Amino acid sequence: MKKLMLIFLGFTSVGFSQTTEIPDPNFEQALIDLGYDNAPINGSVPTANISEVTLLEVYDKNISSLDGIEDFTALNYLSCFDNQLTSLDVTNNVALIQLNCSGNQLTSLDVSNNPALDFLSCNTNQLTSLNISQNTALTELDCIDNQLTSLDLSNNAALTNLKLQTNQLTSLDVSQNTNLTFLNCINNQLTSLDVSNNTALTYLTCRFNQLTSLDISQNTALTALDCINNQLISLDVRNGNNTNFNIFYSTFNSDLICIFVDDADWSATNWTNIDSTSTFVNNEAECDILSLGDNSLVLDVNIYPNPTANYLFIEGNKNPLAISIYNLLGTEVVSEFNTHKIEVSELSKGVYIINVSDGVSQTNKKFIKN
């Protein structure tokens, strides 16, 4: 009888031991609400109730700790965004496919033991580094509003969507990410960006960096480009797909004189979000003409109407003006002084460059003669 009692007590002890500690009451309350635990809150949940769970949504629950998540061993999808987490251990959740832990206070995140991870969103945390070298299945990474200074993407060839806005990146190598279709690297410290290998790219936004040049001529699928507020002096958009663009922004690049495009006339008609100092050109020869007599003091004038058939008017400067008009071969075809009105009716139809100077500063602008 005594032996039977000991065996019974042993089985009872094993039975009672199959619980998982849940120290955070808000986490346990969320599990109660989902039907994985029963009230009242007692700091634990039956392990059998959670070991087969594949989807767990516990976002915006004021949770400070997800301790206990390690026993969700079948978990594929975890949404724990907008909580108060300062740490998150998913090393035991090896089946994890999607993880959204945005809007917390994480200073580190280890996903090295999650090889099946396809989607990772860790926006608005305090991450200074992130190692995704083991996540070769990853197709989307959202890591906006963190403190990353570098990111190694060399093992992530499956990536299609990459969002790294508002970090502290000084360089970004996407040469191995040839499946990339969407790239957001807004508000970093990038001085260069090479996307020549990313021929599948359709959307690129890189505003608020320190880029001095950008060449998207190899990105034949691109239909959206936003490079506002950089330090561009060279921008090549001749990708053969300009007429399919739905977004083009290049303002606040005051040193950008020439923007190389497929068809300068089409771009001038359809793309308006450029600086007044920038001009669309078809080739380097046209850009050379625009740079004639380059002067660091740019004259602020407007010309109208453009296109024109008979006269060009110049407004915005009351000083005596010297005006020269060049064809695209660089030949001066009109020269005038001390006037704000130029007759161009005798010019052949086509594109011309007008140089306007007041003796101190000058500007070059393109116009079309009908």
Set out the residue ranges of the language-model regions.
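Aromatic (phenylalanine/tyrosine) cluster motif
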Residues: 8-11, 81, 119, 182, ...
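N-terminal capping/linker segments that flank leucine-rich repeat
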Residues: 4-6, 11, 15-77, 88, ...
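Canonical leucine-rich repeat
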Residues: 66-69, 88, 109, 130, ...
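Concave beta-strand-loop units of leucine-rich repeat
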Residues: 55-62, 77-84, 101-105, 122-126, ...
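Short, solvent-exposed linear patches
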Residues: 71-75, 92-97, 113-118, 134-139, ...
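Positively charged n-region of N-terminal signal peptides that target proteins for export
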Residues: 1-4, 369-370
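C-terminal outer-membrane/trafficking sorting elements
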Residues: 122, 185, 206, 297-370
